[in-house]
Amino acid sequence: MAHPVHVGLKEATSPFMEELIAFHDHTLMIIFLISSLVLYIISMMLTTKLTHTSTMNAQEIEIIWTILPAIILIMIALPSLRILYMTDEFNKPYLTLKAIGHQWYWSYEYSDYVDLAFDSYIMPTYFLEPGEFRLLEVDNRTTLPMEADIRMLISSQDVLHSWAVPSXGVKADAIPGRLNQAMLASMRPGLFYGQCSEICGSNHCFMPIVLEFSYFXDFETWASYLYIVSL
């Protein structure tokens, strides 16, 4: 969970987000080294009194500044491709959850359960309990089992939306008439917050997402309770 004067990415709860954080650090280190080298060369050019006005070509230097950037790009591309293919791999998900964006709320459908669907609206400020977060709480939290691969299907009923939960490393566009999919998982129980990340109208900032990851037994109990209530 983010907090005031928080700097950096949110704490990861999924293997995907852990990989993204590692890739971020890897790329940032490369950028830092390149920036340091460029600043050093600029400072040397501004302070040195040596000149080479007679130099017409330098084949060795040209080879170096052609090969070195190619190596750096490969060092960035390989881990990026690995994460890209990992996030697109769906190997027997435990359940499928469909998220549909509306102006301005989310609706969820559990495809593996009978009649398990609900709408999730932002919680009005005057209904908040002590310790709850303004503009982030919802009336119906999305409960999911931890340590399970969950396939997300994301779509929209009206305009473009984007379903995003930073701690889980998930961000997928919700496009009318189209289904996008993403893999979701959590290695620990808890509450994880997200928001619509695509400007979708005047109440765009009032479309929070709350995921509640729990143990398998608690999730099945919750699903059974909702089914009984819906009868």
From Swiss-Prot:
Protein's membrane topology: Multi-pass membrane protein
Binding site for Mg(2+): E198
Residues annotated to bind Cu cation A1: H161, C196, C200, M207
PROSITE patterns for the chain: COX2, COX2_CUA, COX2_TM
Compartments where found: Mitochondrion inner membrane
Membrane-side (Mitochondrial intermembrane) residue stretches: 1-14, 88-231
UniProt key word Transmembrane: yes
Keywords: Copper, Electron transport, Magnesium, Membrane, Metal-binding, Mitochondrion, Mitochondrion inner membrane, Respiratory chain, Translocase, Transmembrane, Transmembrane helix, Transport
Transmembrane segments: 15-45, 60-87
GO cellular component term, pick one: respiratory chain complex IV
The record's free-text note on cofactor binding: Binds a dinuclear copper A center per subunit.
The reaction(s) this protein catalyses: 4 Fe(II)-[cytochrome c] + O2 + 8 H(+)(in) = 4 Fe(III)-[cytochrome c] + 2 H2O + 4 H(+)(out)
Role of this protein: Component of the cytochrome c oxidase, the last enzyme in the mitochondrial electron transport chain which drives oxidative phosphorylation. The respiratory chain contains 3 multisubunit complexes succinate dehydrogenase (complex II, CII), ubiquinol-cytochrome c oxidoreductase (cytochrome b-c1 complex, complex III, CIII) and cytochrome c oxidase (complex IV, CIV), that cooperate to transfer electrons derived from NADH and succinate to molecular oxygen, creating an electrochemical gradient over the inner membrane that drives transmembrane transport and the ATP synthase.
UniProt-recorded name of the protein: Cytochrome c oxidase subunit 2
Organism for this UniProt entry: Brachyteles hypoxanthus
Species lineage: Eukaryota, Metazoa, Chordata, Craniata, Vertebrata
